[in-house]
């Protein structure tokens, strides 16, 4: 989700130190467990607010926020949805990928590998994944994300050093929109595979 000016993309690309990104997420096409996530970045610290929502509510949000606030009991969720509605946030991209995740037990540390990252080209229906997809990377790159709370274990740092793995900022959302003509919100390239 983004506003008409693509504020989330603009803030990411300009390196805004305090920013938020809004998304709805499902795993393995399980639409009974939809997550509304707000990814918040404050300087170098990132964290998420997560709300579980029903499919009906997401449909109402997509349908121009056609829901009753009195039906939403969670005060924090209500506050966030009011912000999205008043800021005119709309669905902009549907991004699909396969994820392998690994974590160290009893340590707030995990590594994920996202591959086969694609975006929907013409489909705006969140619940009906189309076959018209566009690869984000044309050379089958994999995105590795390292997530940790306080520190990265020393042996992991040693592995990163051995293979010259350097930190870089990547956004699947920004990459998914690299072919979009933002002047009138249309795709420049609609090459499918």
For the regions a protein language model found, what residue spans apply to each?
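Phosphate-end processing signature that detects enzymes handling 5′-triphosphorylated RNA
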Residues: 1-193
